[in-house]
Amino acid sequence: MVKSIRAPAGEDERKDWLVRFDDSGRKISGVGTPPFEAPIYTQIFKARPDVQAIAHAHAPMCIVLSLADRTVAAVHMQSIPFEQSVPFYARPIHIKDDAEGADLARILGQGRAVIIKAHGLVTAGKSIDEACMTALYLEGDR
């Protein structure tokens, strides 16, 4: 798996800041350390062979929706992937271990998105573009 990280202060932000890690969260190569929430990625990839990319963001509007116990409504063409409601992961925690990651993957099911209560969103796709655009549409579909 590959995850981008923020460029350290004073470093060139145009440079690729990527860390590559295995399915147990151990660093293989790259810059920095694997994210402590690596189980988000490892457990979804394990549960969903069709998924090739995952996006995780601390999206403010999704956080607000989760705190209000409101789901996303399909109100425009870009919200078609959310025609069926986006599930919530009800525990407002960081996903730090395999059991939590597997529980998140179970709640995601065959869907393209899940909102972690008071935390953010996770989207899954067949490409980086699909996972990222799904996240952008989800955050913009208030």
Please name every model-derived segment:
Residues 1-142:
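Glycine-rich flexible loops
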